[in-house]
From Swiss-Prot:
Function (record text): With S4 and S5 plays an important role in translational accuracy.
Listed PANTHER family: 30S RIBOSOMAL PROTEIN S12 FAMILY MEMBER (PTHR11652)
Cited InterPro entries: NA-bd_OB-fold, Ribosomal_uS12, Ribosomal_uS12_bac
PROSITE patterns in alphabetical order: RIBOSOMAL_S12
Protein name: Small ribosomal subunit protein uS12
GO molecular function terms listed in the Swiss-Prot or TrEMBL record: rRNA binding; structural constituent of ribosome; tRNA binding
Species assigned in the record: Christiangramia forsetii (strain DSM 17595 / CGMCC 1.15422 / KT0803) (Gramella forsetii)
Length: 124
């Protein structure tokens, strides 16, 4: 516990909060170009082929971003919109690609939680 005179001389050290999505530079989303689209396997208890893209953002940073939903149309040189949000069972994947924005198509045949996957309202 510091004395009052020590606090007058030095003051309290400010605790700086580290961003969980530093590559976005305090922006809600960023545009980027896919440099590689691939699948990878998740951590131990889970088993799947997760779809991931390596994206070069407009600020020059390269990130790994998850492609949500079933099926996608992304390939190298696709323009995508990247938002924050990590994938718990994929180490190093701290961003999500926004479905239904720019070159990324929405998920086909999706009827529930459509807005999260860029799917249009189905015809009756």
């Amino acid at each position: 516990m510091p004395t009052i005179s020590q606090l007058v001389r030095k003051g309290r050290a400010k605790i700086t909060k580290k961003s969980k999505s530093a590559a976005l530079d305090s922006c809600p989303q960023r545009r980027g170009v896919c440099t590689r689209v691939y699948t990878t396997t998740p951590k131990k208890p889970n088993s799947a082929m997760r779809k991931v893209a390596r994206v070069r953002l407009t600020n020059g940073k390269e990130v790994n971003a998850y492609i949500p939903g079933e099926g996608h149309n992304l390939q190298e040189h696709s323009i995508v919109l990247v938002r924050g949000g990590r994938v718990k069972d994929l180490p190093g994947v701290r961003y999500h690609i926004v479905r239904g924005a720019l070159d990324t198509a929405g998920v086909e045949g999706r009827t529930q939680r459509r807005s999260k996957y860029g799917a249009k309202r189905p015809k009756k």
